[in-house]
Amino acid sequence: MNNIPKSLNVGGQTININIKDRIESDKLGECCVAEARIDIAKTFNGREQAYPSQLNTFYHELTHCILDTMGENELSGNEKFVSCFSSFLCEAMNTLKYD
């Protein structure tokens, strides 16, 4: 999947994906399951976030969203795990081959 979707379902809840010019505290992205949203920043520290980085950020925030929905708050708070897992997921999804 090379495109960031507008929405998806996680645990029976529709999660809306918003591309924003900037996110407070200069984050690349953030998710809030309670508000059913994932936000991805176009800019970070005053610089444009390249599309491949936005896509990786989408998978990073999706990983948080899934773990939070599962009640795995400690694992979701482990940024090393989330970053590593989401990078592998992003790579796998973007290199899918079909016959």
What residue spans do the PLM features occupy?
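Catalytic zinc-binding patch centered on the HExxH motif and its immediate surroundings
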Residues: 1-9, 16-39, 48
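Residue-level recognition of conserved beta-strand positions in structured domain cores
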Residues: 19, 42, 67-69
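Generic recognition of cysteine residues
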Residues: 31-32, 65, 84, 90
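Short pre-active-site segment immediately N-terminal to the catalytic Zn-binding motif
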Residues: 34-57, 72
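Short active-site-adjacent helix-start/loop capping segments
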Residues: 48, 65-66, 75
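Active-site recognition of the HExxH zinc-binding catalytic motif
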Residues: 56-68
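Post-HExxH zinc-binding segment in Zn-dependent metallohydrolases
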Residues: 72-99
